[in-house]
Amino acid sequence: MNPNQKIITIGSVSLTIATVCFLMQIAILATNVTLHFRQNERSIPAYNQTTPCKPIIIERNIKYRNWSKPQCQITGFAPFSKDNSIRLSAGGGIWVTREPYVSCDPSKCYQFALGQGTTLDNNHSNGTIHDRTPHRTLLMNELGVPFHLGTRQVCIAWSSSSCHDGKAWLHVCVTGDDRNATASFIYNGMLVDSIGSWSQNILRTQESECVCINGTCTVVMTDGSASGKADIRILFIREGKIVHISPLSGSAQHIEECSCYPRYPNVRCVCRDNWKGSNRPVIDINMADYSIDSSYVCSGLVGDTPRNDDSSSSSNCRDPNNERGNPGVKGWAFDIGDDVWMGRTISKDSRSGYETFRVIGGWATANSKSQTNRQVIVDNNNWSGYSGIFSVESKSCINRCFYVELIRGRPQETRVWWTSNSIVVFCGTSGTYGTGSWPDGANINFMPL
């Protein structure tokens, strides 16, 4: 071959090889595309199906409350909340209430009260001085929110108690005939249990928060005479179900309207003796074995109303003092070592004014009367009413707080036909504080009749 022929031959062979390679690449590409579409056809459903979207449930590690932290060391009480319900009622749309209280879940506090089934600017408010009607319901709002028309009615009740066990709310709601009332136990929004009157004489309960420790809640209930011997029982409830009932034991003679607080691992209550004593009875509740003991606050500066003058009042820690025991008013106190913090009306005769103070040795020494850290909450020219305790868990300790019911209308203010209240709330503080007075503040002449 001459050189030109060699060049032509090499070029032809190269072109042939290149063509074959090109065709092979096309074949490979076609094969891949075919396989890809066949694979997709197998994975696509034959019909236009939809896959349901299931919610992802994230379970929080919710635990029962045990209140095992120590009690906060306080110097006194600082203002926390005031709802101004009566002043706001002058403009209408606020419930008529009484028997208010405060209780908290692990993250937020709520105010409760027993509504009268009417607003204040409504003719149905006439006669709401009466305690027990079938129209009364337990109201619940976030603390500081007055009971407006959108307020939740938790249950039917003319006597109640509520507490949160760390997982859900328990409400104890008493209603019905005086001689045959029913207490309903509502847990997590559902009716779980009930109990009927055992003495056929106005079954009633605390009108403030119950207490739950490690899932078991306890509440004090009374059935019987308001001015004589009554049948007092302490109920233990778990997730709304009554698991045990203990009778009152110890030296207390009469128990009503207890203000209870956790004293880990047990519960302690300071109550109202409506029969023999103006010194307040104490109930100690053992949450492990359901045993009960009772006595009286040792302080000679007694907490009930009416009462003797401080110079002549007394308490021996064990027995009612037989000093103006009837009728009485709901109140509170709590121990701090051998001392006692307490609140009471300023007037020894009527429900007016409100003060708090610490009595040195008032929990351990009979008739102790050394008072310190006194504060005026409501001056004596203004009406007060019931008061009670509630507990709040902080990062390091258990704080004690209290509320005061500020009653307006009848029986003291006869210009109007209704009876209702607002509240003011204070909590323990380790800081400093000033002075003041926090009455209801409504001008009765501005109010609907």
From Swiss-Prot:
Alphabetized UniProt keyword annotations: Calcium, Disulfide bond, Glycoprotein, Glycosidase, Host cell membrane, Host membrane, Hydrolase, Membrane, Metal-binding, Signal-anchor, Transmembrane, Transmembrane helix, Virion
Gene Ontology annotations of biological process type: carbohydrate metabolic process; viral budding from plasma membrane
Enzymatic class: hydrolase
Keyword Metal-binding: yes
Notes on the domains: Intact N-terminus is essential for virion morphogenesis. Possesses two apical sorting signals, one in the ectodomain, which is likely to be a glycan, and the other in the transmembrane domain. The transmembrane domain also plays a role in lipid raft association.
Subunit structure: Homotetramer.
Name the UniProt record assigns to this protein: Neuraminidase
Organism from which the protein derives: Influenza A virus (strain A/Chicken/Pennsylvania/1370/1983 H5N2)
Gene it is expressed from: NA
